[in-house]
Amino acid sequence: MHFTYCPHCGTKLTEKGIGDEGLIPYCEHCNVPLWDMFTTSIITAVVNEQGEVALLRQNYVSTTNYVCVAGIMKLGESAEDTVIREVKEEIGQDVEKLEFIKSYPYPKKEMLMLGYKATVQKKDFHLSGEVDSVEWVKLEDAPNKLREGGIAWQLVKTIIERS
């Protein structure tokens, strides 16, 4: 989010040079810089002990490609707690091990996605209402089912390269 007006007092912002950051939106009335903001979210490749990854169909996200478990961090929640919660909520799996992979800027959605690999013991899926279907796919086959170049694709490719 890029501020044009101060969210505290409503004054139209000016720009002020701040150190190495360059020109930053600034409220002369409140004497505060207003940095651009973004939503922080997680994306995780859920991998079982057989080397399979859970790929989801969420028609509100894409009707043509599979996706990975993803979600927005709640206020006061760590990224790791968000991964554990989202994996349980969306597909009913219990995370046994977490590994941070990489952060992914997503400018189109004004988002920063924190990418993880979540290891689980394979069990039956229990889907939330926002998941249309899910299936286990061999990790090496997963990129072919994801949108090439997309964040889920990049995450899975990085995990494969590190294996």
Predicted regions and their residues:
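N-terminal leader/linker segments that precede catalytic domains of diphosphate-processing enzymes
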Residues: 1-61, 72-124, 163
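Nudix hydrolase/Nudix homology domain
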Residues: 1-2, 14, 63-66, 107, ...
